[in-house]
Amino acid sequence: MAKHITGPEIERLIHLLARIPGLGPRSARRAALHLIKKKEALLEPLGTAIRDAVDKVRICSVCGNIDTTDPCSICTDPRRDNGTIIVVEDISDLWALERAGTLLARYHVLGGRLSPLDGIGPDELNITSLINRVIKDPITEIILAVNATIEGQTTAHYITDQLSNFSIKITRLAHGVPVGGELDYLDDGTLAAALRARTNF
């Protein structure tokens, strides 16, 4: 059995860092060591930022984005097109589309995609709240900006079916988004072109 060579506080820091996507145990140890070496310049400000995030960050009750206000700054931005909602799987997809800066629309974060094998059905996603927005607000277009995976396309078809009784235009991102690709990994130019060339769904 491996012997602990650090105190429990450091072990806990390493353990928690290792739970961050993309960081394994070895990377977490390196990150923890770097943070501790830069205690005043990095560790203490990071601790403060994390405490602030715990205290102040909340999920927007309208679109599902995260912000320090509810509704979020996107939902309250008067420059946005109130008639257009871009539907995304995750907040990281919203951020990617915002970086592209092509379309000032509203968003709706599903919180995932349909995946029966993983136990994720319509009730686990923010689909009902999307339908309620369409009922309540004067929406003219829904842009399905879901990932070009099998699960993403299944989700898009399900949403299209649920909205079939409404007189709204439903489009999806153009096929410039590679099949099997994740929005968060695409460059800004590709995302901008995909938004401009969206097609009926």
UniProtKB/Swiss-Prot annotation:
Keyword annotations of the record: DNA damage, DNA recombination, DNA repair, Metal-binding, Zinc, Zinc-finger
PROSITE patterns for the chain: RECR, TOPRIM
Pfam families, A to Z: RecR_C, RecR_HhH, RecR_ZnF, Toprim_4
Claim: Zinc-finger is one of the keywords in the record: yes
GO MF, one annotated term: DNA binding
Gene3D superfamilies listed in its UniProt record: 3.30.60.80, 3.40.1360.10, 6.10.250.240, RecR Domain 1
Entry protein name: Recombination protein RecR
Gene source species: Bartonella bacilliformis (strain ATCC 35685 / KC583 / Herrer 020/F12,63)
